[in-house]
């Protein structure tokens, strides 16, 4: 990476306007296409990660799935494999602890030589939420949430950026944040989670500033997605609390919880070339929760 002598990395001499990733000749139907590229997904075996993997495969990209289990569970993985086969896309899975810097580097070294197409995208779905009263919450648990949600996002983004820089290819990253990065959740004590997602918002802006116009580097756009409450197995326990579902549904303008499939189009938009003038932004898909 080019170094500055005056310490101001955003001085004009270190910035340049990159060619747009967008193509005005593309038809509207092509704006969500991800052909001839590889997209990396962390937390890929979860409900959101596996749903997005299917959507990305259907949009023409090869997919590298990363997650903590040694092997993906059949429940979600069979549909992902079937989609890859049907669309003749390359699909691979690697076990990875996103908080382990050496493991991240080693895993990237394993899969990069096997790819058909250059890495041009990243979606970070790996995350953790733990709840409990802050006056009793262990520091170790607080650190774990921050380590996975913030450090893990950074480490994989760093490795992805290095792959793009090495190949001199442009790309787009989508960090899964949360509307919880804007305010405290009602009904549950999740100070660590809320803090971590606010940090992801700031990480998004910071990396977008670094990789948007730096001389000598390819253009890498960085945006985040902030979902509202999603009805999944991960939220099932919280929803069992008396009055919780009424609380959560009543706090947004659509008066319901979201489904994982409702985040496919927003992520495809941010990954694709149709969002070529979007970087450093957070796309809040929360049913109007934070606007009320």
UniProtKB/Swiss-Prot annotation:
It is an enzyme of class 1 (oxidoreductase). NADP(+) binds at residues 48, 97, 158, 193, 197, 230, 232. The keyword NADP applies. Residues 1-25 are annotated as: Disordered. It holds the Pfam family adh_short_C2. GO terms for biological process: secondary metabolite biosynthetic process. Keywords: NADP, Oxidoreductase. Notoamides have been shown to exhibit antitumoral activities. Notoamides A-C show moderate cytotoxicity against HeLa and L1210 cells with IC(50) values in the range of 22-52 mg/ml, but the IC(50) value of notoamide D is greater than 100 mg/ml. Moreover, notoamide C induces G2/M-cell cycle arrest at a concentration of 6.3 mg/ml. Belongs to the short-chain dehydrogenases/reductases (SDR) family. This is Short chain dehydrogenases/reductase notP'. It comes from Aspergillus versicolor. The gene is notP'.
């Amino acid at each position: 990476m080019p170094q500055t002598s005056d310490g101001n990395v955003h001085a004009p001499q270190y910035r340049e306007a990159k060619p747009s990733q967008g193509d005005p000749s593309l038809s509207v139907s092509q704006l969500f296409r991800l052909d001839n590229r590889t997209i990396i997904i962390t937390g890929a075996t979860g409900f959101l990660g596996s749903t997005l993997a299917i959507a990305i495969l259907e949009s023409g990209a090869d997919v590298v799935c990363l997650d903590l289990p040694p092997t993906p569970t059949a429940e979600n993985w069979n549909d992902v494999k079937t989609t890859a086969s049907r669309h003749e896309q390359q699909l691979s899975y690697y076990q990875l602890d996103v908080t382990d810097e050496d493991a991240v580097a080693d895993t990237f070294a394993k899969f990069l030589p096997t790819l058909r197409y250059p890495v041009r995208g990243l979606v970070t779905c790996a995350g953790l939420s733990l709840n409990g009263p802050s006056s009793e919450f262990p520091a170790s648990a607080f650190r774990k949430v921050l380590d996975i949600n913030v450090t893990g996002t950074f480490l994989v983004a760093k490795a992805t950026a290095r792959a793009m820089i090495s190949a001199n290819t442009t790309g787009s990253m989508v960090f899964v944040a949360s509307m919880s990065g804007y305010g405290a959740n009602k009904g549950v004590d999740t100070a660590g989670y809320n803090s971590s997602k606010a940090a992801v918002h700031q990480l998004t802006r910071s990396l977008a500033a670094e990789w948007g116009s730096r001389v000598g580097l390819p253009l890498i756009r960085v945006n985040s997605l902030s979902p509202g409450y999603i009805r999944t197995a991960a939220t099932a326990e919280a929803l069992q609390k008396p009055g919780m579902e009424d609380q959560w549904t009543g706090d947004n303008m659509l008066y319901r919880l979201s489904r994982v499939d409702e985040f496919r189009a927003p992520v495809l938009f941010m990954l694709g070339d149709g969002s070529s003038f979007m970087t450093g932004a957070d796309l809040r898909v929360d049913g109007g929760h934070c606007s009320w």
